[in-house]
Amino acid sequence: MLSTLMKLLSACLWPSSSSGKSSDSTGKQDGLLWYKDFGQHLVGEFSMAVVQANNLLEDQSQVESGPLSTLDSGPYGTFIGIYDGHGGPETSRFVNDHLFQHLKRFAAEQASMSVDVIKKAYEATEEGFLGVVTKQWPTKPQIAAVGSCCLVGVICGGMLYIANVGDSRAVLGRAMKATGEVIALQLSAEHNVSIESVRQEMHSLHPDDSHIVMLKHNVWRVKGLIQISRSIGDVYLKKAEFNKEPLYTKYRIREPFKRPILSGEPTITEHEIQPQDKFLIFASDGLWEQMSNQEAVDIVQNHPRNGIARRLVKMALQEAAKKREMRYSDLKKIERGVRRHFHDDITVVIIFLDTNQVSSVKGPPLSIRGGGMTFPKKI
C-alpha cells in the first residue's frame, strides 16, 4: 500500500520521462507530448493527450471517475476538467487543485449532483484564487493578470452537465437514427469576443463604455487586452484595486471601473444522455483553431478508440505545420516557448459513452491529470 502511494506521489510531482517508458497508469511522455491512450471510466472508456507549446504548460486537465462527493453514498460518476491558462500557469494549476474538491464538498451537502453544485464550485474556486492574488499582490503583483478558461463536464445519473467560462469547447458525437451518420453537436457556450453575440453581450453589460471591445491588430479584445469575456482569475479586470501600480502598464486601464469588466460566472447546461450519444470531445481552443467540430467527430468515429486523443492532437499539429508551409517532422523539433509561435498548448479528452453503463452506481475509481503530474503547491 505504501509503495503504491509513493509511486502515485512520484507521478504527481515529476513529469514522466521523455523515453515514453513511464507507467501507463499516469500516461506516457514523448518529448512535448503527453498521452494516456486508453483507460476505463465509470460509464465507458476514455483517451487523453496534451502537447505543450508554451515555455511553461498553461493547459491543465483532469479526469476523475468514481465518487463525486465526500460521502460513501455518492453520487458517483465522471468529472472532466479542461483549464486553459493565460498569462502564466498559476490560475489553471489552482483550478486543477481546487475545483473538483469544491464540487465534491457541495455535492455532499446536497447529496446530489446539480447545476447549483457546479455553479457553487466555480464561485468557490474564483473566490479562492482572489485570495491568492490578494495575498501575493505586494510581492508578485503580476499574478493579478493571470487567468484561466474553465470547461467542466460531469456525467452522473444518466445526465450530462457542461459548464464553461472562456473558449474551450465540448462537442458531442451523436448517431442519427435514420442514417447512422455521426454528427457533431457543440454543447458548451463560448465566451470569446470574436463571436458577435458575445460582443453584443459585452456592450449591453457596459452601455456607457464605447471601448469595452476593441479591434486590435485585426483581433477583437475586451478593452484591447483579452479575447475572452469570462474566466477564472484575471482579477485586474474584475477588481479596480488590482488595476494600478505596480501592475505592468500594458495591463492597466486609464479610466477607473466600478463594476467587473470580466465575469467568472459559468454557462451551465444539462443534457439527458441518449442511446445515440456516442462520445464527447473536450478540448482547449488549441485544437479548435486547427479543425472544425465535425472534422474532430469524424476522426474519432472513423478510427480505433485506443490512442484517439493522441491522433487528434497529431492531426491538429499537422494542420498547424501545413499553415506555416513546413513539415510536421520539422515542427516536432521546435522547442517549447518558440513552439508557441506555431500553435497553442493543446489538450484533448475523449469520453466514450457506453449507454448500458451510464446509469451504473459504482465502479473502480480513477484520477488522472493531463501531463501525468501536478506541481508542488506554492500558492
From Swiss-Prot:
InterPro entries: PP2C (IPR015655), PP2C_BS (IPR000222), PPM-type-like_dom_sf (IPR036457), PPM-type_phosphatase-like_dom (IPR001932). Its EC number is 3.1.3.16. The keyword Oxidoreductase does not apply. Keywords: Hydrolase, Magnesium, Manganese, Metal-binding, Phosphoprotein, Protein phosphatase, Signal. Mn(2+) 2 binds at D84, D285, D344. Belongs to the PP2C family. It comes from Arabidopsis thaliana. It comes from the Eukaryota. The modification Phosphoserine is found at S73. The keyword Magnesium applies. Mn(2+) 1 binds at D84, G85. Residues 42-353 form the PPM-type phosphatase domain. Binds 2 magnesium or manganese ions per subunit. GO terms for molecular function: metal ion binding; protein serine/threonine phosphatase activity. It is an enzyme of class 3 (hydrolase). This is Probable protein phosphatase 2C 46. It catalyses: O-phospho-L-seryl-[protein] + H2O = L-seryl-[protein] + phosphate; O-phospho-L-threonyl-[protein] + H2O = L-threonyl-[protein] + phosphate. Interacts with SAUR19. May dephosphorylate and repress plasma membrane H(+)-ATPases (PM H(+)-ATPases, e.g. AHA1 and AHA2), thus influencing negatively plant growth and fitness. Its cofactor is Mg(2+); Mn(2+). The gene is PP2C46. Residues 1-20 form the signal peptide.
